[in-house]
């Protein structure tokens, strides 16, 4: 699994621990200005793999390291839940713009390319892309200047991959939720679907919300 350090990624990692004996995780800490250094260090220390999203070489190194750790990659879960930047446009530090683009937009394209190459060569595998459909406040956050842009890019990437999924030898699925604060249930829902996944699910978008358990 790879993704932003967030309530969503923590819930998915916790569910992963309960379901598998061995996994590999690369989490992106919030490196925006004002983020507590101790939190960045804590996230970096507990992840099993290092990843610099701005580097295509790092994406390849990450997948090689994951294969060495796990022997092979059967399933990859990518989680985009970018941090918020609540600031007047004129006051946003240029460094934060660069970090947001590198960590929350550009890196996903590099990593998806590497994973797709692995799954294509093996002619099997599951690529799951996960994102929230709303902000962490539970409604669209108009005060967040850059977070929604990063999320929109990941959503568009997901939609493109799902549209092309039927021509690929591996399975690509998407997951989104509109139930902020219920990340634990969403994580359980994701793994319930993945546990039962088949080729018929190729290109499908699974949406978690109030009525998901009745689908």
Task: Name each model feature, range by range.
Residues 81-111, 117-166, 176-179:
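Catalytic loop of short-chain dehydrogenase/reductase
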Residues 11-15, 34-43, 149, 153-161:
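Short, aromatic/basic amphipathic alpha-helical patches
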Residues 152, 163-215:
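C-terminal helical subdomain
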Residues 16, 67-68, 120-121, 166, ...:
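Residue-level signal for alpha-helix termini/capping positions
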